[in-house]
Amino acid sequence: MRLRNLEHNENAKKKEIIVYCSENWNCSNNALRKLFFRSSFHLRGPLAWLALSLSRKIKIFHSFSSIANRNLPIDRAGLLTKQLTMLKFSNEEVCKGQSFLASCEIKSRFVCLHVRDSAYLTTTMGQQRKKHDYRDSEIKTYVAAAESLAEMGYTVFRMGAIVKEPLVSDNPRIIDYAANGMRTELLDIFLGAHCTFTISTGSGWDSVPTVFRRPIMFVNQLPVYAPSVTTLQSVTFPKILLDNQTGSILSLKNLIDREIAHRANSQAYKDAGVEIRDLSSEELVEAVTEMAQRVEGTFVETPEQKEMQAKLKHILSTHQKLQPSPNYYPIRAQFASCFLSRYPNFLHGLD
């Protein structure tokens, strides 16, 4: 929805009004829905269906389009980097958010950590969603990374509406917001909108820091190539994919040849003979350290890393099995330099 508004603002030659129509406005977060309603004009129920019917028939309406089947927001035009967010918190909401931060004795920098597991879909959908298992991680592997960020002076909020296990750490700068009773729907949005940066494994909540233009790093991210991620100005350290017969780490060329580089289904990886390995605690520490340095402006890439970044961007921008045409989905994301240094064979076999 946010991208639809930005596309409109970018292309509009005369004053127009966008009207969103829906049978219902079920939403996973009511605080976010309030922000949307505050910034856009919406109709719902029978009135919405009447408006939709009229928009198809009467020429006074400039255009009609459906966003019902737009499952993934892909920012081809780079509008998220060109324009400021249209969502605004009320004074009351800002006061509540600031009071919460003050109660946690947070005066400056904090990071949101969101680690996907099976609990949310199992609880909300009423069944185990095996299709998405490949995206899950174990929160215990992130403890060392969170503690590393805390040592750098950041407070770390573990995010999530429904989580499988607690984040266990004695460090007072690490707050298991998702499991300790602090969580509210407003704070879900406020924290994502005001964090110094976000570390996430890829989920619906990522839209919050994205919409509010907060820096984001995706760790344990799959698929390796996803236009909804690679068109963002983000940093990625993907899960490690191996041949399930030989145990050898698969290169990007291997993934493309097996038609698995872009697949978003657990069964697809099994059918392709691919084993998925989550990042180790050590790798996660490297990843978040690099992200903190990038945000702080202290990160320095080696000449070899710069060369690998350029090569990878060229491949992702032009490969005919990844792009309908060259640069159709502009590559604005970078892969973590520590990933490229650890796995230089990832780029072997491709020019």
Model-derived features: where do they sit?
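Conserved donor-binding/catalytic core segment of Leloir-type glycosyltransferases
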Residues: S108-K130
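Catalytic core of nucleotide-activated saccharide and alditol-phosphate transferases
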Residues: L32-L101, L121-Q127
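Short, well-ordered alpha-helix to beta-strand connector turns
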Residues: F37-S39, G153, H194-C195, F212
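Leloir-type glycosyltransferase catalytic cores
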Residues: S65-Q98, S103, L232-D351
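A donor-sugar binding/catalytic signature common to diverse glycosyltransferases
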Residues: D188-S234
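Catalytic donor nucleotide-activated moiety binding site of glycosyltransferases and closely related
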Residues: L113-L121, I139-T184, P303-L312
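Short, solvent-exposed loop/turn segments at secondary-structure junctions
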Residues: N24-N26, R116-Y120, I162-E165, G204-D206, ...
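Active-site and donor-binding regions of nucleotide-sugar-utilizing enzymes
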Residues: M1-S66, A161-V163, Y177, G181-M182, ...
